[in-house]
Amino acid sequence: MSQASSGFTPAAQVQHGSSKGAFNSAYIPTEEEKRVFRECNSESFWYRSLPFSAIAVGITQVLVAKGMLSPSPRFGALPKIAFAGIFGYIGGKMSYVRVCQEKFMKLENSPLGEALRQGRLRHVSSEMNQPDFDPNSSESQQPGSESVQQPATEVSSATESYSSYTSDYTYSTPSQSYETTPFSSGFSDSGPANIRDDLPSQAPLYMEEDVPKRKPVLYEELRNKNRENYEVTLPQKNQTQMKPQMEVMQPKKEAKKNKYGDSWEE
């Protein structure tokens, strides 16, 4: 952008300086910027601060009336309502900052608007093109490229060291070096591994020998045993039932009685 199109004069550029230190405590805004400041103050008050304060005060009064907020014993609900109004006023002002920035950026001959535009463009470009234009990113990527090239050399060196190790220390497979031994010889110091190999295979044999095998009991055998027991107990029951009957069937001898009706024996 040229000086004629932007409206900047050399004096203005010297006064405001570079983009980094453009605005200091001695900056004097232009008439257009003052007008935008007044518009932002009035619009932020009527469109944001006043509605937000009214809503906050109304909500606080409702909460105090319903008992959700306890009023002060000395001042009542006034402190809470005042705090809600101040909070709504500040929140409304802060919410209108973005709109004011847009208004300043629309000004053509405003150093403040130009600074805001450059700051936004710089922020957007840093977010969009940071991996492409950041010099530190290229330096940070160099160790990654070196690490990509290193695995091939590391693999080759690892294979060489492994081959040298295997040539120095030969070994055999477990099936070739270990031979199975009986369980009795497994308790020697030379064969601790054989104990683990023989125990699982020989333990079931000893368990089977200790436990006697039981023949399955058939239903017919149980039935015959019950019949034998019943036949043995049946005569005993018959004898016990016949004894009372024999006693009942024996007639009693009539004793002689005297004239008074008493029985007496000779």
From Swiss-Prot:
Residues 135-155, 179-188 have a biased composition (Polar residues). The keyword Transcription does not apply. Disulfide bonds: none annotated. The keyword Cell membrane does not apply. Its main location: other. Keywords: Endosome. Residues 250-266 have a biased composition (Basic and acidic residues). It is found in: Endosome. GO terms for cellular component: endosome. Residues 156-178 have a biased composition (Low complexity). Residues 127-213, 225-266 are annotated as: Disordered. InterPro entries: OCAD1/2 (IPR040187), OCIA_dom (IPR009764). Residues 1-114 form the OCIA domain. Belongs to the OCIAD1 family. PANTHER family: OCIA DOMAIN-CONTAINING PROTEIN 1, OVARIAN CARCINOMA IMMUNOREACTIVE ANTIGEN. This is OCIA domain-containing protein 1.
